[in-house]
């Protein structure tokens, strides 16, 4: 999506702040969900899209027009379109993927545009690694 949209809208800067993480669920379902958010971001952005990814959340924001506060969460229902939207299915698909994998999605206005956040209420438990090595003088931890 980013590469295709960059050809169509080269004036949009894509800013990334991404950690290597693993979200629960099927990779294809997440690809479709993220593509839907990114397509919307490219449709409405004025000059930039920012993608941030951490262990338990993902945020895609842009500097496009703000959404009416009373309509933001309704955009996750099927056939609900924002101004300039196409079919009203993209964010509904995002919502279904999130729910199926125990994540939450929300949209909100930001200081300079709109952002969509996917997150978990409960953080994933990380397993402790055994036999880790400290790179301090080659000593074993």
Q: Over which residues does each language-model region extend?
A:
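Conserved micro-motifs of the catalytic ATP-binding
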Residues: 18, 22-28
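A residue-level detector for a conserved hydrophobic packing site
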Residues: 30-34
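Short helix-loop "hinge" at the ATP-lid/N-box region of the Bergerat-fold HATPase_c
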Residues: 40-42
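Short beta-strand/loop element within the Bergerat-fold HATPase_c
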Residues: 46-57
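Glycine-rich acidic phosphate-binding loop
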Residues: 61-66
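Short conserved segment of the HATPase_c
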Residues: 67-79
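Short alpha-helical Gxxx[C/S/T] motif in the catalytic ATP-binding
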Residues: 90, 94
């Amino acid at each position: 999506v980013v590469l295709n949209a960059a050809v169509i809208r080269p004036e949009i800067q894509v800013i990334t702040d991404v950690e290597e993480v693993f979200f629960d669920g099927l990779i294809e379902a997440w690809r479709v969900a993220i593509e839907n958010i990114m397509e919307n971001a490219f449709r409405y952005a004025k000059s930039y899209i920012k993608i941030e990814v951490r262990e338990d959340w993902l945020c895609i924001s842009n500097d496009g027009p703000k959404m009416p506060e009373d309509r933001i969460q309704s955009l996750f229902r099927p056939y609900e379109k924002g101004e300039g939207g196409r079919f009203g299915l993209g964010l509904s698909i995002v919502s279904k993927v999130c729910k199926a994998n125990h994540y939450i999605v929300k949209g909100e206005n930001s200081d300079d545009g709109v952002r969509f956040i996917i997150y978990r209420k409960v953080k994933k438990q990380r397993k402790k690694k055994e036999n880790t090595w400290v790179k301090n003088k080659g000593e074993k931890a």
